């Protein structure tokens, strides 16, 4: 039986759909109280309706990369629940598909700010509010693209590789404070974010994976919940590939 997360409070950024929403549900199923974030109040309301967890789930609207939203979210969680035991950095963007050498500087800055620096900022606030004194668990969302480049996706992969290195560094620095920091690196998951890689071409997408299918949000969510829980109490600084075996293949094989 999975370890109970009763009396644990989690923040899941980007928690209104896809992997983030599935993660919130998995944490709730283990007994945690969860705060999800998202940019749209309508999407937050819909997500909370789907979660159907009553007072154990709240939502805060705002831009995940903005300091004011980070401050307001952590302050509300502390005021309502008294702790921040788990942080899941689930927000990521990929607004550019093309050659990395042609990546506009302003887009590069936006990607790095949202995909990497925001994760650090959220961590810092959670550490200052609670984790620095009481310990905690952080799970960052990276990508299989961090390990292997592909056409048009190199820039996104670079930010996700940085996320892995950030995970390792924070894990090393914060272990004495009993803060565990890990990451997950999914392959193609059937979400709106990754729709262009599977929607309308599911057979080809599945063929790229030795296990014969693209991932589901729940595949990733359950791994995140495991890493966040006491089941992973002696695991830190690790990145778990959840990719249906994709990284076992070569780039040539996956594109054949």
Task: Cite the ranges covered by each PLM segment.
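Short, small/polar-rich loop/turn modules that mediate ligand/substrate recognition or access, typified
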Residues: 175, 180, 235-237
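Active-site helix of classical SDR
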Residues: 123, 159, 167
């Amino acid at each position: 039986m999975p370890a109970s997360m009763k009396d644990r409070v989690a923040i899941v950024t980007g928690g209104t759909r896809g992997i983030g929403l599935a993660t919130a549900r998995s944490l709730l199923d283990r007994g945690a109280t969860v705060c999800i974030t998202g940019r749209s109040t309508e999407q937050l309301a819909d997500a909370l309706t789907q979660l159907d967890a009553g007072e154990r789930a709240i939502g805060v609207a705002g831009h995940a990369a903005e300091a004011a939203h980070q401050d307001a979210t952590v302050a509300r969680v502390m005021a309502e629940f008294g702790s921040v035991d788990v942080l899941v950095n689930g927000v990521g963007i990929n607004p550019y598909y093309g050659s990395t050498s042609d990546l506009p500087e302003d887009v590069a800055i936006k990607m790095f700010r949202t995909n990497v620096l925001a994760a650090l900022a959220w961590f810092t606030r959670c550490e200052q509010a609670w984790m620095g004194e009481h310990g905690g668990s952080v799970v960052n969302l990276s990508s299989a693209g961090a390990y292997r480049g592909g056409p048009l996706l190199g820039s996104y992969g670079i930010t996700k590789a940085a996320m892995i290195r950030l995970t390792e560094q924070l894990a090393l620095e914060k272990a004495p404070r009993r803060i565990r920091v890990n990451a997950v690196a999914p392959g193609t998951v059937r979400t709106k974010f990754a729709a262009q890689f599977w929607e309308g071409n599911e057979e080809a997408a599945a063929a790229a994976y030795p296990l014969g299918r693209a991932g589901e949000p729940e595949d990733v969510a359950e791994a995140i919940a495991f890493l966040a829980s006491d089941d992973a109490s002696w695991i830190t600084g690790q990145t778990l590939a959840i990719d249906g075996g994709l990284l076992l293949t070569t780039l040539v094989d996956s594109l054949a």
